[in-house]
């Protein structure tokens, strides 16, 4: 592949995946600045790769490299704290208070997610924040596709149960 085409390919990958990788790495290392370093290193490694070798599974390759680098950083620093300030997209809504309601629900879901086992949190984030398929998640986490599906199902079921319980509790107060 000629250099101009490779550069275009890398820029396209950066545009498409940088935000998702940054949120994923920040969740693992617990710090946005360290996550930026991890994502930067991920893309530096992409620059050294032959596009033909990974173009059919670029997302899996990027997330796997990012995950491994982030885990190395976390292991070195031997600590992990939850991401306190998650990025959210602004919501436009005609109904007054809907945006605040959405933010409260999102905050509640994120708080409840922190109570889930680590493997369930990871597959949830890869699925819903990064919009990856079960197969891609399977390759990144080295779990079977069936196990990914089970973890997602269990996590969603648990979150739904907890959200309903909290909602009912608020209603009766």
Language-model-derived ranges and their functions:
Residues 71, 141-166:
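DNA-recognition helix of helix-turn-helix
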């Amino acid at each position: 592949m000629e250099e101009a085409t490779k550069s275009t390919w890398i820029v396209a990958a950066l545009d498409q995946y940088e935000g998702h990788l940054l949120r994923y790495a920040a969740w693992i290392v617990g710090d946005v600045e360290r996550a930026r370093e991890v994502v930067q290193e991920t893309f530096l490694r992409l620059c050294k790769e032959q596009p033909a070798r990974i173009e059919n599974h670029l997302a899996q390759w990027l997330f796997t490299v990012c995950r491994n680098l982030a885990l190395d950083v976390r292991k070195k620093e031997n600590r992990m704290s939850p991401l306190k300030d998650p990025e959210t997209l602004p919501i436009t809504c005609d109904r007054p208070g809907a945006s605040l309601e959405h933010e409260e629900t999102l905050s509640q879901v994120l708080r409840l997610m922190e109570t889930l086992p680590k493997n369930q949190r990871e597959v949830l984030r890869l699925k819903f924040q990064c919009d990856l398929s079960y197969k891609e998640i399977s390759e990144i986490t080295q779990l079977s596709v069936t196990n990914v599906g089970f973890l997602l199902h269990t996590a969603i079921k648990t979150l739904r149960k907890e959200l309903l319980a909290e909602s009912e509790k608020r209603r009766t107060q």
